[in-house]
């Protein structure tokens, strides 16, 4: 033991002592977190380190740039507002994609973009609002301490809608001081309905944000999204889409036009590009289920047939159009749609 003492580098003693003092001081300043629990690690997903197969926000450069400019604005955070299914989360992932690939301004390069599931964070706290308040306070303290985190909260209206969480705590008030000082940078996302019902009523919370309106993508944008997204489904399922570029574009255009023409009779809440992406994803899943190495017209046909619509007549019309438009390739693949 004495030998070990003689081998100690005395030059490190002061450093070690200082480190120990800092740890003690940290525990003194935050007695509610003696075990140094990281809420960001427990409930967060790091979107700036995520492995992206493709750019998740194709055709949304303008909205992404708007959000980034807001994040560069002192003491302001970004609020994405749009209908359900327009791709709010995809836009935030698009920012994460840019961060991962160094495609952002230098001022944001030290930052990490972390998505926190606020519903899980609050939903699990059934023992009482004291535990909820403690978790939120730990999150706020962690954000203030690290200072290089951009927090993304989907359904950000939950922070001000206390009726949803059945709590009497105003969680938004816990964030306001940090947002005011610029200690906390944030991206929130919500729908127009929730924005008008809850966010607009809390003017003090709202003034910390600048709004980015997300319009529904048009037909051309949606087709580009499908063309840019299908490689992700190839990787996930191990199934390939091996048609020519011309035929791929023709298939995706049909799907986009179908969802455009009948989007008003699809189940409420589905919008571009949500329905179209679901159909393409379903085609890949069906091929994987059948252990097929490739996606065929049969799989697209089945996916279209299984799409939920309110009026069955609309689906019948679209199926007839599909059969006519792709009759040559259906014949080439020897697909008998009458057997399905």
Give residue spans per PLM region.
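AAA+ P-loop NTPase nucleotide-binding core of proteostasis motors
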Residues: 2-340
């Amino acid at each position: 033991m004495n030998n070990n003492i003689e081998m100690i580098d005395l030059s490190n003693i002061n450093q070690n002592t200082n480190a120990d003092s800092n740890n003690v001081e940290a525990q003194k300043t935050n007695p509610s977190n003696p075990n140094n629990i990281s809420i960001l690690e427990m409930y967060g997903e790091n979107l700036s380190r995520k492995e992206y197969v493709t750019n998740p926000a194709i055709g949304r450069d303008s909205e992404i740039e708007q959000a980034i400019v807001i994040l560069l604005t002192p003491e302001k955070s970004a609020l994405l507002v749009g209908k359900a299914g327009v791709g709010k989360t995809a836009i935030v992932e698009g920012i994460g994609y840019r961060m991962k690939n160094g495609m952002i301004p230098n001022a944001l390069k030290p930052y990490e973009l972390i998505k926190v599931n606020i519903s899980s964070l609050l939903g699990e706290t059934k023992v009482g609002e004291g535990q909820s308040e403690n978790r939120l306070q730990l999150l706020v303290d962690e954000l203030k301490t690290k200072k290089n985190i951009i927090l993304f909260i989907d359904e950000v209206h939950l922070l001000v809608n206390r009726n949803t969480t059945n709590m009497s705590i105003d969680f938004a008030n816990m964030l306001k001081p940090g947002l005011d000082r610029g200690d906390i940078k944030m991206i929130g996302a919500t729908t127009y309905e929730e924005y008008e019902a809850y966010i607009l009523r809390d003017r003090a919370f709202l003034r910390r944000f600048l709004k980015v309106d997300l319009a529904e993508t048009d037909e051309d944008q949606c087709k580009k999204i499908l063309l840019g997204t299908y490689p992700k489904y190839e990787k996930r399922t191990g199934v390939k889409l091996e048609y020519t570029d011309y035929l791929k574009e023709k298939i995706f255009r049909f799907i986009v036009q179908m969802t455009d023409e009948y989007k008003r009779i699809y189940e409420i809440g589905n919008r571009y590009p949500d329905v179209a992406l679901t159909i393409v994803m379903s085609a890949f899943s069906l091929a994987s289920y059948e252990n097929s190495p490739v996606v065929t017209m049969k799989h697209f046909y089945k996916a279209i047939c299984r799409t939920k619509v309110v009026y069955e007549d609309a689906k019948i019309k679209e199926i007839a159009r599909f059969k006519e438009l792709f009759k040559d390739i259906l014949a080439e693949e020897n697909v008998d749609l009458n057997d399905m």
